[in-house]
Amino acid sequence: MPKNSKVVKRELDDEVIESVKDLLSNEDSADDAFKKSELIVDVPEEKDTDVVERSEVKDARPAWNSKLQYILAQVGFSVGLGNVWRFPYLCQKNGGGAYLLPYLILLLVIGIPLFFLELSVGQRIRRGSIGVWNYISPQLGGIGFASCVVCFFVALYYNVIIGWSLFYFSQSFQQPLPWDQCPLVKNASHTFVEPECEKSSATTYYWYREALNISTSISESGGLNWKMTICLLAAWVVVCLAMIKGIQSSGKIMYFSSLFPYVVLICFLIRALLLNGSVDGIRHMFTPELEIMLEPKVWREAAAQVFFALGLGFGGVIAFSSYNKRDNNCHFDAVLVSFINFFTSILATLVVFAVLGFKANVINEKCIAENSEMIIKLVKMGNISQDIIPHHINFSAITAEDYDLIYDIIQKVKEEEFPALHLNACQIEDELNKAVQGTGLAFIAFTEAMTHFPASPFWSVMFFLMLVNLGLGSMFGTIEGIITPVVDTFKVRKEILTVICCLLAFCIGLIFVQRSGNYFVTMFDDYSATLPLLIVVILENIAVSFVYGIDKFMEDLKDMLGFTPNRYYYYMWKYISPLMLLSLLIASIVNMGLSPPGYNAWMEDKASEKFLSYPTWGMVICISLMVLAILPIPVVFIIRRCNLIDDSSGNLASVTYKRGRVLKEPVNLEGDDASLIHGKISSEMSSPNFGKNIYRKQSGSPTLDTAPNGRYGIGYLMADMPDMPESDL
């Protein structure tokens, strides 16, 4: 193309090259210039194709070795610790079996459509979260940065939980288990049971004192817990080694880390069903309380669980799907992974309540034995008449039914004096109604249940190895949500970035392995992700449905999948999902405002938990976590809206596209026109120096409403987009 070629008007079906700097500018003057300017380029179609083909051969983006590996990676990321220790708690708390109906409805309304959306944009644009949202709308490019920040915050404390699991795993190779009984304290005169343990339980004591060595408040740091520091280091080393070689390495690990938890859950379920009382737990779990289902709180908690169970907004879903082939059926993947996640939660719920049913039965038998002895003592002391005890009852082999009968009789006969007798009802339902979740379920309730298992060390090893694998699967996706977009955007070496990221996270994570570290884990879990992720996903939905255009997006899906997705998704993305997400955001803000910010501190002298409010500096950290997570969104918007950064200097808003694919930036636009048109890429293009950029318009494509900026969308770019090599992104 001659250097002195002039800009003239042509018909819409002519071949055109446009400047991305003009297209990405949101100022009216730039838009007017775009509307009036087109460059005449007469280029044979086959030569342009040669450019793409040769470039793709030279620079290929890493890809999954197989479809199974990819599915396992997505399953490993979405199926995490929350499926085991959060979903069963919510199910029990919110009406048992009745909770499954609102959860399933919201999975169809929010979960699958938004999961499908993230898979689609990642696979179509083939970049991480930063590149995807910057590509769709530069002014909303901060969404990707916000996702990275949230991923980093979550990774900080999530790996601490993996460290805890590693500690318990390492301590499980003992018979008996170290948390089976309370330790004895010896002094010069006599031996006695540790008072803190005697007031609570052996498993509770082991968790708070032996494992965490916890302080009494968040203000009392107490120094580092060296045992947990080593475990945290080991967890980060495992994550770093798995991620450092990219998806080829982490993908292979997924074969074990994603499948092993299912083996353990099935083994636990079979073993638990053979134990006495397991059926009571499952029956209690799925006894529906339909009246609870109508409460708004149930729907809010179900929506939040659906939202976080699938890992929406983290960027890991987008990062994993960006390594797929362009024609992969991501709709099938979205439905498959979503229902695998759902049925995993059901399986985990069956296991949890079968085990807790057994535990409740053991505790109930112990309660009956202790209270029977107390009744015998009261009879001998004359406080209870022997005549009111039925003659057929044998206290040496008393059943639960016999004890219930005696308890009711004594309660009626000694109505006024009954409270002073200190007898317990010993009901299995009372024990099952003690809802536990999170660390309380995994490290206290479940560990206590396993002490009553035959061959308890074996089951303990299996259980905590399962937790480690569940955690690692989610961690791989979380770290991928940081690494992939940064590598795609800034062209740094993945190995170096991975090591730096893991090393930095370990250093910051030392605050979680202080004696007060558990309180910081609670703080980060409550404030670093919930609201920021909701805002991120709402903006993702808006960016695709309204900024880019839902109609063009549906056309892109048709081109990519080979069929038009059901119209159901059109209405979900455009109307229902945004309204549901906005309602969930408002409800979460209201709930956060009504709930006093604080944490449950362990009181050593009382051997019980006590709710404490965060100190002033703690509140500052809570607010800072939320602000820092969403801060990139308005910052990037203002920078791009006000043109505070010169696109020619090489920033994220300036990217070169050609026939729907990203090209390396020519150093000199005019000097490189001829080589680009004739199918040659100069050696100078290897440097991603973003400056003047060019577009080539396909014949027959629409005009302004298909331009590649936030206002006009990117329809024609995505309509014929070949696989984009990572080096070209």
From Swiss-Prot:
The keyword Transport applies. Residues 163-225, 357-452 are extracellular. It is a multi-pass membrane protein. It is found in: Membrane. It catalyses: L-leucine(in) + Na(+)(in) = L-leucine(out) + Na(+)(out); L-isoleucine(in) + Na(+)(in) = L-isoleucine(out) + Na(+)(out); L-methionine(in) + Na(+)(in) = L-methionine(out) + Na(+)(out); L-proline(in) + Na(+)(in) = L-proline(out) + Na(+)(out). One of its GO terms (molecular function) is proline:sodium symporter activity. InterPro entries: B(0)AT2, Na/ntran_symport, Neutral_aa_SLC6, SNS_sf. The modification Phosphoserine is found at S25, S55, S687, S699, S701. GO terms for cellular component: membrane; plasma membrane. One of its GO terms (biological process) is proline transport. It holds the Pfam family SNF. The chain crosses the membrane at residues 70-90, 98-117, 142-162, 226-244, 253-270, 306-323, 335-356, 453-472, 496-514, 530-550, 571-592, 620-642. Glycans are attached at N187, N213, N383, N394. It comes from the Eukaryota. Residues 1-69, 643-729 are cytoplasmic. Keywords: Amino-acid transport, Glycoprotein, Ion transport, Membrane, Neurotransmitter transport, Phosphoprotein, Sodium, Sodium transport, Symport, Transmembrane, Transmembrane helix, Transport. Belongs to the sodium:neurotransmitter symporter (SNF) (TC 2.A.22) family. SLC6A15 subfamily. Functions as a sodium-dependent neutral amino acid transporter. Exhibits preference for the branched-chain amino acids, particularly leucine, valine and isoleucine and methionine. Can also transport low-affinity substrates such as alanine, phenylalanine, glutamine and pipecolic acid. Mediates the saturable, pH-sensitive and electrogenic cotransport of proline and sodium ions with a stoichiometry of 1:1. May have a role as transporter for neurotransmitter precursors into neurons. In contrast to other members of the neurotransmitter transporter family, does not appear to be chloride-dependent. PANTHER family: SODIUM-DEPENDENT NEUTRAL AMINO ACID TRANSPORTER B(0)AT2 (PTHR11616:SF101), SODIUM/CHLORIDE DEPENDENT TRANSPORTER (PTHR11616). This is Sodium-dependent neutral amino acid transporter B(0)AT2. It comes from Bos taurus.
